[in-house]
Each structure stands twice: as C-alpha cells, then as structure tokens.
Amino acid sequence: MTGAWGHLLRSLHLKTLSLWIPKTCFSLKARAFWTSVTRCGLHTKPSMPPCDFTPERYQSLAYSRVLEIHKQHLSPVHTAYFPEPLLLHQGHVEWLFDHEGNRYLDFFSGIVTVSVGHCHPKVNAAAQRQLGRLWHTSSVFFHPLIHEYAEKLSALLPEPLKVVFLVNSGSEANDLAMLMARAHSNSTDIISFRGAYHGCSPYTLGLTNVGIYKMDLPHGMGCQPTMCPDIFHGPWGGSHCRDSPVQTIRKCSCAPDCCQAKDQYIEQFKDTLSTSVAKSIAGFFAEPIQGVNGVVQYPKGFLKEAFELVRERGGVCIADEVQTGFGRLGSHFWGFQTHDVLPDIVTMAKGIGNGFPMAAVVTTPDIAKSLTKRMLHFNTFGGNPMACAVGSAVLEVIKEENLQENSQEVGTYMLLKLAKLRDEFEIVGDVRGKGLMIGIEMVKDKESRQPLPREEVNQIHHDCKCMGLLIGRGGLFSQTFRIAPSMCITKPEVDFAVEVFRSALIQHMERRAK
C-alpha cells in the first residue's frame, strides 16, 4: 500500500488479520460456513493485547442450530447486533470468546453491566459459597446477607438516603420509585427528559421517551416529557458546558463560570412546569448522563436548578443511576454527585451485580414510610441470598481494586485519545462522556450535525467487531457508538480499541472514495 493511506496505516502498527468470522448463514444449513475477514473488506488489524487465559472448547449447539432455535422459539423482539450474530461462549475479565475460540475486547460490558470484569474470581467464589448454603427464602424470613448488604450499600450514600429496597432489574426499581414518589407527594405528574430511558414495563414506558420503545397503547399515565438539555443537538450549547475532559465543538462566548445554555434550558423546564403539569407534582426522573440516548450530558448546574424547581412544586427528585453508578464516572461513586445535587430517591441496577439480576431503590426514611402507609410492597426474589452475596463481593472488589480511580484515569485517557479522532475525521461529530461512560456520535458532517446514515454506522460497527472490538449503539437514530467497558480496563487495551476504531474509520473513508 502506498500514499497517504499506507503511511497512516503503517503508523498504526497494523498487521495482517488472522481472525476468522462466520459468514452470514441464515440459510440454516447443517453447518456454519466461514470466511476470512478479507471478505468483509478488511485486510489489516491492530495487534491485540496479550491475554493469559485459554477458553474451554465449545461443545454445545452448532451455530446453525442456534439460529434455527432462535427463529422458531425465541420472541422476535430478541434482536442481536450484526447480520451474523456472535455466539459467545466464555468470558474472562475484559475479554469474550465465541464458539470458535475467537477473542473480543468487550467495550460494552453487557450494556453497561459487567462492572468488575467477566467471571471475577472473588465474585465467582462468593456465588459458589452461597450456592451450597442457601438460595432463596423470600423477605418473609430473615437471612443475614440482606442485612449485611443493606448496611454496606447505604454507607456509600449520603444522609438521609439510608433505606434500601432490593429488587431485580432497573425497570422494577424505577417502577417502585414512581410508586414512592406518588405515595409521598399525593400527586400524580412525573417529569422526565426527552431521550430518557427508564425501563420498558407498562409503568416506566411513560418515563421512557425514545421512540422505538413507545407503543400505540395506553401506558404511563401522568408522565410528562420535557426538553432534554442536549448541548450538542439542542438549540443551545457551547464549549464550556460539559463536565467532561472533552467539550463539544460548538463555540460560545460564555465565561467558564457562566453558562447561557443552562439558563435557556432552565427556562424551557419552567415552561413545562407552567403549562404541562398540575400545580403540585409527584416528581422528576433524571439519569445523571443519558445512556440509551447516546451518552448525552447536560450543562453544568442544570440539574441543581431543576431539582429546586421540582421541590417548589412538592415533587421528589429521582436519580436513575442504573448506568452511571458504582464509580463508573470516575470522579464520584454516584452520578448525581457530579451535579452537586442530593436526590430524594436513587435507583440502581446493572453494575450492582456485575451481571447477576439485582437492583435497588434507596430513599429517605420519610419517603419509605409514605409507601408503607399506602400499600404492602412485596418482591419474591428481591434481596435473595444469592444476589446479596454477589452484590457484597462486587462492592468489595470496587474498593479493593480501586476501580473508581481506574475509571477516572483510564476513562480520561481514552476520551482524550478519541477526541483526536474527532478532530481528524469529519464524520466523527462529537466525543463526550465522563470516566468509562463514553459516546462517539457519527455525523454526515460537523456543520450540519445530521446523523450518519444507519447503514454506514452499521458497517463501521461491523468492521470493529471483525477486528475484535465489541462496542454498543445508542441515540435516537442509533448514530452514537457507546463505550462502557468493565472498570478494570487498562490503557494498553484502550490503545488497541482506539486503533481498531481508527482503522474502521479509514476503511469507511476508503469505501466512500470508491
């Protein structure tokens, strides 16, 4: 290879690709057919960092049989990334292995869930010990682990957030938080941002404001959307707005301690309060950083003023920490702390159990009592001994291995490296995030900020997978790549991931030029 592209590829230390991937095989033949990555248009890939783990030999269903069963017996709503879905077999720390033994760097961690690494030995050991001791009792009988875990978790939250309700998923946690807010306030209306994702239950669908999750059926009575203070796509935003090492390319004349964008978005929030809800409201839900919408950050100071306005109307403020909690943002253990606010209710899931089904709602004694006066709340599996054993081990690993600090250091390192790609490639419109919660928004061009067509984003996504990197998708048009690896990720692994992404962008530009 000669010319500018050859020089660029050589500078990335790229080498011939030896990874093999499955050819699209929805014809369901008796065996899977295989093709080299050169059939995908890829000729080179960055060198993977070493891994001192050998996966077990895959001995389960044939790939073609998996596709057949999926088509016949699993709901069609169970969709997968890529035309030839990965059949994953084993995990080790940051790595995943498919049924052919191919290795992938997991930079999405099961949708921001595997917080301390796949099959962490301490978490595994805790689960194995409890498996031989006691699986389930329900909350009508006491067991020590739920009490030990509640004490550990509440110690990580500021006063007066000290009462813990354990459930099984983020949707369940937000469902319960909605009940608490309405029981405590004696009001109905709850506000959430456009672009918010708070769950897919019939109740939380009212809070979720992403079109693909909406149905033409009654749901979420009393839920009111409000403008998301999105400083990249919204009407206001500039170069000092975000709490991030990387700012938007939009320019502004604001002084560093003054944000006109924040003031304008607060006026929109006031307008919602004045026109769209009752004089007394039940509450306001907010993710500290929007996840499903593509890692959207708000102007600094916005949530603090919004919380004050909600409380003036008698509402409670709920922080949805399902994706942002447990040290992922680096500078603080909880996302709400990065906004200098104190919520009345905090919901959490995903990283709480490193992939084990577990979630929690933490609130104040007064709000907890309000629910008790209204109803008997019961959850069969919430707080079961297995979940509490796993959850306790996860908290211990985060502390012992300094994973919050690692999120800050390695996340900042990655953001700054990705920002250089934004400056280099016209189709990389924005790089944003904090710690190990990062978004890369793909655009037609930086001036229009219009989303890159889905088929082009799909191809870049697929090319990354072909080179051994798994990343997520988000945004209203699926135009944003979401990066949220386990918090034990290292700088050499970041270097590999950034080189892969850059190579995928180069491949895309070569295709465009043909």
Swiss-Prot record:
Superkingdom of origin organism: Eukaryota
InterPro entries named in the record: Aminotrans_3, Aminotrans_3_PPA_site, PyrdxlP-dep_Trfase, PyrdxlP-dep_Trfase_major, PyrdxlP-dep_Trfase_small
SUPFAM superfamilies on file: PLP-dependent transferases (SSF53383)
UniProt keyword annotation of Acetylation present: yes
Cofactor field: pyridoxal 5'-phosphate
Positions of post-translational N6-acetyllysine modification: K71, K262, K417, K420
Residues the record lists as N6-(pyridoxal phosphate)lysine modifications: K350
Transferase in keyword set: yes
First and last residues of the transit peptide: 1-41
Keywords: Acetylation, Aminotransferase, Mitochondrion, Pyridoxal phosphate, Transferase, Transit peptide
Function: Multifunctional aminotransferase with a broad substrate specificity. Catalyzes the conversion of glyoxylate to glycine using alanine as the amino donor. Catalyzes metabolism of not L- but the D-isomer of D-beta-aminoisobutyric acid to generate 2-methyl-3-oxopropanoate and alanine. Catalyzes the transfer of the amino group from beta-alanine to pyruvate to yield L-alanine and 3-oxopropanoate. Can metabolize NG-monomethyl-L-arginine (NMMA), asymmetric NG,NG-dimethyl-L-arginine (ADMA) and symmetric NG,N'G-dimethyl-L-arginine (SDMA).
Family per record: Belongs to the class-III pyridoxal-phosphate-dependent aminotransferase family.
Name of the protein described by the UniProt record: Alanine--glyoxylate aminotransferase 2, mitochondrial
Gene (UniProt): AGXT2
